[in-house]
Swiss-Prot record:
Organism: Vibrio atlanticus (strain LGP32) (Vibrio splendidus (strain Mel32))
Encoding gene per record: bioB
Residues bound to [4Fe-4S] cluster: 53, 57, 60
Reported cofactor(s): [4Fe-4S] cluster; [2Fe-2S] cluster
Entry keywords, A to Z: 2Fe-2S, 4Fe-4S, Biotin biosynthesis, Iron, Iron-sulfur, Metal-binding, S-adenosyl-L-methionine, Transferase
UniProt family annotation: Belongs to the radical SAM superfamily. Biotin synthase family.
GO-annotated molecular function: 2 iron, 2 sulfur cluster binding; 4 iron, 4 sulfur cluster binding; biotin synthase activity; iron ion binding
Catalytic reaction(s) noted: (4R,5S)-dethiobiotin + (sulfur carrier)-SH + 2 reduced [2Fe-2S]-[ferredoxin] + 2 S-adenosyl-L-methionine = (sulfur carrier)-H + biotin + 2 5'-deoxyadenosine + 2 L-methionine + 2 oxidized [2Fe-2S]-[ferredoxin]
Listed name of the protein: Biotin synthase
NCBIfam families cross-referenced by the UniProt entry: bioB (TIGR00433)
Subunit structure: Homodimer.
Annotated positions binding [2Fe-2S] cluster: 97, 128, 188, 260
EC number: 2.8.1.6
Amino acid sequence: MEVRHDWTVAEVRALLEKPFMDLMFEAQVVHRQYQEHNHVQVSTLLSIKTGACPEDCKYCPQSAHYRTDVDKERLMEVERVLDAAQKAKNAGSTRFCMGAAWKNPKERDMPHLTDMIKGVKGMGLETCMTLGMLTPDQAGELADAGLDYYNHNLDTSPEFYGSIITTRTYQDRLDTLSHVRDAGMKICSGGIIGMGESTNDRAGLLVELANLPVHPESVPINMLVKVKGTPMENVDDVESFDFVKLIAIARIMMPMSAVRLSAGRENMNEQMQAMCFMAGANSIFYGCKLLTTPNPDEDTDMQLFKKLGINSQQVAQKPDEIQENELLDQVVERVAARPTKDDMFYDATV
Protein backbone atom coordinates (compact mmCIF):
# COMPACT_ATOMS: atom_id res chain seq x y z
CA MET A 1 0.00 0.00 0.00
CA GLU A 2 1.34 3.43 -0.94
CA VAL A 3 1.29 6.44 1.36
CA ARG A 4 -1.33 8.88 0.08
CA HIS A 5 -2.24 12.53 0.61
CA ASP A 6 -5.37 12.71 -1.55
CA TRP A 7 -8.05 11.01 0.54
CA THR A 8 -11.72 11.94 0.24
CA VAL A 9 -14.57 11.83 2.74
CA ALA A 10 -16.37 9.39 0.45
CA GLU A 11 -13.44 6.96 0.67
CA VAL A 12 -13.43 7.16 4.45
CA ARG A 13 -17.18 6.58 4.53
CA ALA A 14 -16.65 3.47 2.42
CA LEU A 15 -14.10 2.19 4.94
CA LEU A 16 -16.52 2.88 7.79
CA GLU A 17 -19.18 0.81 6.05
CA LYS A 18 -16.93 -2.25 5.72
CA PRO A 19 -17.68 -5.26 7.93
CA PHE A 20 -15.87 -4.75 11.23
CA MET A 21 -13.64 -7.82 10.93
CA ASP A 22 -12.64 -6.95 7.36
CA LEU A 23 -11.65 -3.44 8.41
CA MET A 24 -9.66 -4.75 11.37
CA PHE A 25 -7.86 -7.24 9.13
CA GLU A 26 -6.97 -4.54 6.59
CA ALA A 27 -5.69 -2.23 9.32
CA GLN A 28 -3.57 -4.97 10.89
CA VAL A 29 -2.04 -5.87 7.52
CA VAL A 30 -1.08 -2.23 6.96
CA HIS A 31 0.19 -1.96 10.52
CA ARG A 32 2.50 -4.95 10.12
CA GLN A 33 3.77 -3.61 6.80
CA TYR A 34 4.80 -0.24 8.21
CA GLN A 35 5.11 -0.62 11.99
CA GLU A 36 6.68 -2.96 14.52
CA HIS A 37 3.80 -5.13 15.70
CA ASN A 38 3.21 -5.95 19.38
CA HIS A 39 5.06 -2.75 20.22
CA VAL A 40 3.69 0.36 21.93
CA GLN A 41 5.49 3.66 22.47
CA VAL A 42 4.90 5.17 25.91
CA SER A 43 4.72 8.90 26.66
CA THR A 44 4.04 10.89 29.82
CA LEU A 45 2.11 14.17 29.78
CA LEU A 46 2.57 16.90 32.40
CA SER A 47 0.55 20.09 32.75
CA ILE A 48 3.15 22.84 33.26
CA LYS A 49 0.52 25.63 33.42
CA THR A 50 -3.01 24.71 34.35
CA GLY A 51 -6.36 26.48 34.03
CA ALA A 52 -7.61 30.00 33.19
CA CYS A 53 -7.16 29.48 29.46
CA PRO A 54 -8.78 32.29 27.41
CA GLU A 55 -9.92 29.88 24.70
CA ASP A 56 -13.54 28.68 24.69
CA CYS A 57 -13.06 25.04 23.60
CA LYS A 58 -16.34 23.49 24.77
CA TYR A 59 -14.74 20.21 25.79
CA CYS A 60 -12.02 21.67 27.98
CA PRO A 61 -12.19 22.01 31.79
CA GLN A 62 -9.22 24.41 31.68
CA SER A 63 -11.16 27.11 29.83
CA ALA A 64 -11.79 30.29 31.83
CA HIS A 65 -15.21 30.46 30.16
CA TYR A 66 -16.59 27.54 32.21
CA ARG A 67 -16.99 26.79 35.90
CA THR A 68 -15.19 23.52 36.60
CA ASP A 69 -13.16 22.12 39.48
CA VAL A 70 -9.85 22.98 37.77
CA ASP A 71 -7.86 25.61 39.66
CA LYS A 72 -5.54 27.95 37.81
CA GLU A 73 -1.85 27.46 38.51
CA ARG A 74 1.27 29.40 37.70
CA LEU A 75 3.87 28.27 35.22
CA MET A 76 5.68 25.37 36.88
CA GLU A 77 9.26 25.79 38.06
CA VAL A 78 11.91 24.22 35.83
CA GLU A 79 13.20 22.07 38.68
CA ARG A 80 9.74 20.57 39.27
CA VAL A 81 9.37 19.80 35.57
CA LEU A 82 12.74 18.05 35.49
CA ASP A 83 11.87 16.07 38.61
CA ALA A 84 8.63 14.89 36.97
CA ALA A 85 10.53 13.99 33.80
CA GLN A 86 13.01 11.88 35.74
CA LYS A 87 10.17 10.01 37.44
CA ALA A 88 8.53 9.44 34.06
CA LYS A 89 11.76 8.03 32.66
CA ASN A 90 12.18 5.76 35.68
CA ALA A 91 8.63 4.47 35.10
CA GLY A 92 9.41 3.55 31.49
CA SER A 93 8.35 6.56 29.42
CA THR A 94 10.45 7.43 26.40
CA ARG A 95 8.84 10.78 25.58
CA PHE A 96 7.96 13.58 27.98
CA CYS A 97 5.20 15.93 26.89
CA MET A 98 4.61 19.32 28.52
CA GLY A 99 1.29 21.14 28.13
CA ALA A 100 0.33 24.72 28.98
CA ALA A 101 -3.21 26.10 29.01
CA TRP A 102 -2.55 29.13 26.82
CA LYS A 103 -3.89 30.63 23.62
CA ASN A 104 -0.23 31.09 22.77
CA PRO A 105 3.02 31.55 24.72
CA LYS A 106 4.24 35.08 25.39
CA GLU A 107 7.82 36.10 24.76
CA ARG A 108 8.48 36.17 28.51
CA ASP A 109 7.65 32.46 28.61
CA MET A 110 10.17 31.34 26.03
CA PRO A 111 13.39 31.25 28.15
CA HIS A 112 11.69 29.07 30.76
CA LEU A 113 10.24 26.75 28.13
CA THR A 114 13.57 26.30 26.39
CA ASP A 115 15.23 25.50 29.72
CA MET A 116 12.63 22.79 30.30
CA ILE A 117 13.30 21.31 26.86
CA LYS A 118 17.07 21.27 27.33
CA GLY A 119 16.81 19.74 30.78
CA VAL A 120 14.49 16.94 29.67
CA LYS A 121 16.61 16.27 26.57
CA GLY A 122 19.60 15.95 28.84
CA MET A 123 17.94 12.95 30.48
CA GLY A 124 17.81 11.09 27.19
CA LEU A 125 14.06 11.53 26.71
CA GLU A 126 12.26 12.73 23.61
CA THR A 127 10.49 16.03 24.20
CA CYS A 128 7.06 17.28 23.18
CA MET A 129 5.16 20.46 24.01
CA THR A 130 1.64 21.75 23.47
CA LEU A 131 1.44 25.48 24.09
CA GLY A 132 -1.25 26.72 21.73
CA MET A 133 -0.55 28.76 18.62
CA LEU A 134 3.03 29.62 17.66
CA THR A 135 4.66 32.29 15.55
CA PRO A 136 7.39 31.20 13.11
CA ASP A 137 10.03 32.73 15.42
CA GLN A 138 8.70 30.87 18.46
CA ALA A 139 8.66 27.60 16.55
CA GLY A 140 12.27 28.21 15.56
CA GLU A 141 13.26 28.97 19.15
CA LEU A 142 11.70 25.74 20.43
CA ALA A 143 13.36 23.77 17.66
CA ASP A 144 16.75 25.33 18.44
CA ALA A 145 16.33 24.25 22.07
CA GLY A 146 15.92 20.66 20.87
CA LEU A 147 12.15 20.13 20.96
CA ASP A 148 11.35 16.93 19.07
CA TYR A 149 7.55 17.09 18.77
CA TYR A 150 4.94 19.82 18.92
CA ASN A 151 1.31 18.92 19.58
CA HIS A 152 -1.46 20.99 18.05
CA ASN A 153 -4.68 19.10 17.41
CA LEU A 154 -7.16 19.92 14.68
CA ASP A 155 -9.87 18.59 17.04
CA THR A 156 -12.57 17.91 14.42
CA SER A 157 -13.60 18.61 10.83
CA PRO A 158 -13.52 22.18 9.43
CA GLU A 159 -17.32 22.04 9.11
CA PHE A 160 -17.98 21.17 12.77
CA TYR A 161 -15.13 23.20 14.22
CA GLY A 162 -17.12 26.44 14.69
CA SER A 163 -19.59 24.60 16.91
CA ILE A 164 -16.79 23.73 19.33
CA ILE A 165 -14.39 26.69 19.32
CA THR A 166 -14.77 30.37 18.38
CA THR A 167 -11.60 31.94 19.80
CA ARG A 168 -9.25 30.63 17.11
CA THR A 169 -9.87 29.51 13.55
CA TYR A 170 -9.18 26.22 11.83
CA GLN A 171 -6.69 28.07 9.65
CA ASP A 172 -4.90 29.29 12.79
CA ARG A 173 -4.32 25.65 13.69
CA LEU A 174 -3.10 24.74 10.21
CA ASP A 175 -0.77 27.75 10.22
CA THR A 176 0.79 26.64 13.51
CA LEU A 177 1.36 23.16 12.09
CA SER A 178 3.09 24.76 9.09
CA HIS A 179 5.34 26.83 11.36
CA VAL A 180 6.26 23.71 13.34
CA ARG A 181 7.08 21.74 10.20
CA ASP A 182 9.07 24.62 8.70
CA ALA A 183 11.14 24.82 11.90
CA GLY A 184 12.11 21.16 11.48
CA MET A 185 10.12 19.66 14.34
CA LYS A 186 7.88 16.61 14.20
CA ILE A 187 4.14 17.07 14.43
CA CYS A 188 1.68 15.48 16.85
CA SER A 189 -1.85 16.27 15.69
CA GLY A 190 -5.16 14.47 15.97
CA GLY A 191 -8.64 15.07 17.28
CA ILE A 192 -11.46 14.26 19.66
CA ILE A 193 -14.29 11.82 19.06
CA GLY A 194 -17.61 12.11 20.87
CA MET A 195 -18.38 15.85 20.84
CA GLY A 196 -21.65 15.41 18.97
CA GLU A 197 -20.03 15.39 15.56
CA SER A 198 -21.49 13.50 12.59
CA THR A 199 -19.93 10.53 10.81
CA ASN A 200 -18.94 12.91 8.02
CA ASP A 201 -17.18 15.13 10.55
CA ARG A 202 -15.18 12.18 11.85
CA ALA A 203 -14.24 11.28 8.30
CA GLY A 204 -13.41 14.92 7.58
CA LEU A 205 -11.00 15.12 10.51
CA LEU A 206 -9.04 12.11 9.26
CA VAL A 207 -9.02 13.50 5.71
CA GLU A 208 -7.58 16.82 6.94
CA LEU A 209 -4.82 15.02 8.84
CA ALA A 210 -3.99 12.54 6.09
CA ASN A 211 -3.93 15.20 3.38
CA LEU A 212 -1.36 17.40 5.09
CA PRO A 213 1.80 17.70 2.95
CA VAL A 214 3.54 15.36 5.40
CA HIS A 215 1.55 13.11 7.71
CA PRO A 216 1.87 13.93 11.42
CA GLU A 217 4.46 11.66 12.98
CA SER A 218 2.02 11.12 15.84
CA VAL A 219 -1.79 11.08 15.58
CA PRO A 220 -3.58 11.12 18.96
CA ILE A 221 -7.19 9.92 18.77
CA ASN A 222 -9.01 11.09 21.90
CA MET A 223 -12.36 9.88 23.18
CA LEU A 224 -14.11 12.80 24.85
CA VAL A 225 -13.80 12.86 28.62
CA LYS A 226 -16.98 14.58 29.78
CA VAL A 227 -16.31 17.09 32.55
CA LYS A 228 -18.96 18.69 34.72
CA GLY A 229 -19.22 22.41 34.08
CA THR A 230 -18.27 22.26 30.40
CA PRO A 231 -20.87 22.48 27.61
CA MET A 232 -19.98 18.89 26.68
CA GLU A 233 -20.80 17.31 30.04
CA ASN A 234 -24.02 15.65 28.82
CA VAL A 235 -23.24 14.61 25.25
CA ASP A 236 -23.94 11.01 24.24
CA ASP A 237 -21.25 8.39 24.72
CA VAL A 238 -19.26 7.12 21.75
CA GLU A 239 -20.13 3.60 20.62
CA SER A 240 -17.06 1.42 21.25
CA PHE A 241 -16.99 -0.21 17.82
CA ASP A 242 -17.26 3.19 16.12
CA PHE A 243 -14.21 4.40 18.02
CA VAL A 244 -12.19 1.29 17.19
CA LYS A 245 -13.09 1.70 13.52
CA LEU A 246 -11.65 5.21 13.53
CA ILE A 247 -8.39 3.91 14.99
CA ALA A 248 -8.26 1.34 12.18
CA ILE A 249 -8.97 3.93 9.49
CA ALA A 250 -6.34 6.30 10.90
CA ARG A 251 -3.85 3.43 10.63
CA ILE A 252 -4.83 2.70 7.02
CA MET A 253 -4.72 6.37 5.96
CA MET A 254 -1.49 7.27 7.79
CA PRO A 255 0.49 4.02 7.81
CA MET A 256 3.83 5.50 8.87
CA SER A 257 2.43 7.57 11.74
CA ALA A 258 2.19 6.52 15.36
CA VAL A 259 -1.51 6.30 16.19
CA ARG A 260 -1.91 7.22 19.84
CA LEU A 261 -4.72 5.89 21.98
CA SER A 262 -5.04 9.06 24.02
CA ALA A 263 -7.64 10.61 26.36
CA GLY A 264 -10.58 8.45 27.36
CA ARG A 265 -8.70 5.22 28.09
CA GLU A 266 -9.86 5.41 31.71
CA ASN A 267 -13.36 4.70 30.39
CA MET A 268 -12.29 1.81 28.14
CA ASN A 269 -12.19 -1.76 29.39
CA GLU A 270 -9.27 -4.06 28.57
CA GLN A 271 -11.12 -5.64 25.66
CA MET A 272 -11.77 -2.29 23.96
CA GLN A 273 -8.16 -1.21 24.40
CA ALA A 274 -6.99 -4.54 22.99
CA MET A 275 -9.17 -4.00 19.91
CA CYS A 276 -7.64 -0.55 19.48
CA PHE A 277 -4.14 -2.05 19.53
CA MET A 278 -5.29 -4.68 17.04
CA ALA A 279 -6.64 -1.86 14.86
CA GLY A 280 -3.23 -0.20 14.75
CA ALA A 281 -2.85 1.99 17.83
CA ASN A 282 0.79 1.84 18.87
CA SER A 283 1.27 4.67 21.34
CA ILE A 284 -0.28 5.65 24.67
CA PHE A 285 0.07 8.22 27.41
CA TYR A 286 1.32 6.59 30.60
CA GLY A 287 0.43 7.78 34.09
CA CYS A 288 -2.60 8.50 36.22
CA LYS A 289 -3.52 11.88 34.70
CA LEU A 290 -3.61 13.57 31.27
CA LEU A 291 -3.32 17.28 32.06
CA THR A 292 -6.46 17.40 34.24
CA THR A 293 -8.34 14.21 33.27
CA PRO A 294 -7.93 10.68 34.69
CA ASN A 295 -5.84 8.02 32.95
CA PRO A 296 -5.07 4.39 33.86
CA ASP A 297 -2.12 4.06 36.24
CA GLU A 298 1.20 2.58 35.13
CA ASP A 299 0.72 -0.80 36.82
CA THR A 300 -2.64 -1.30 35.11
CA ASP A 301 -1.09 -0.58 31.72
CA MET A 302 1.83 -2.94 32.32
CA GLN A 303 -0.55 -5.70 33.36
CA LEU A 304 -2.55 -5.22 30.17
CA PHE A 305 0.60 -5.23 28.04
CA LYS A 306 1.66 -8.49 29.68
CA LYS A 307 -1.71 -10.10 28.96
CA LEU A 308 -1.52 -9.04 25.31
CA GLY A 309 2.17 -9.81 24.80
CA ILE A 310 2.87 -6.17 23.98
CA ASN A 311 6.32 -4.70 24.48
CA SER A 312 6.56 -1.08 25.57
CA GLN A 313 9.32 0.91 23.92
CA GLN A 314 12.34 1.29 26.12
CA VAL A 315 14.23 4.54 26.51
CA ALA A 316 16.10 5.34 23.32
CA GLN A 317 19.88 5.51 23.23
CA LYS A 318 21.08 7.70 26.05
CA PRO A 319 23.04 10.82 25.07
CA ASP A 320 26.76 10.82 25.72
CA GLU A 321 27.20 11.22 29.47
CA ILE A 322 29.40 14.29 29.12
CA GLN A 323 26.87 15.98 26.85
CA GLU A 324 24.05 15.08 29.25
CA ASN A 325 25.87 16.60 32.22
CA GLU A 326 26.73 19.71 30.23
CA LEU A 327 23.10 20.23 29.25
CA LEU A 328 21.86 19.85 32.81
CA ASP A 329 24.63 22.11 34.16
CA GLN A 330 23.70 24.82 31.66
CA VAL A 331 20.06 24.69 32.71
CA VAL A 332 20.93 24.84 36.42
CA GLU A 333 23.30 27.77 35.84
CA ARG A 334 20.66 29.75 33.92
CA VAL A 335 18.04 29.10 36.58
CA ALA A 336 20.42 30.11 39.38
CA ALA A 337 21.34 33.33 37.57
CA ARG A 338 17.79 34.61 37.40
CA PRO A 339 16.79 37.31 39.91
CA THR A 340 14.10 35.77 42.12
CA LYS A 341 11.68 32.91 42.12
CA ASP A 342 8.72 35.30 41.99
CA ASP A 343 10.16 37.19 39.02
CA MET A 344 10.85 33.98 37.18
CA PHE A 345 7.62 32.15 37.81
CA TYR A 346 5.04 34.86 37.30
CA ASP A 347 1.34 34.19 37.04
CA ALA A 348 1.19 33.11 33.40
CA THR A 349 -2.58 33.52 33.29
CA VAL A 350 -2.33 37.31 33.12
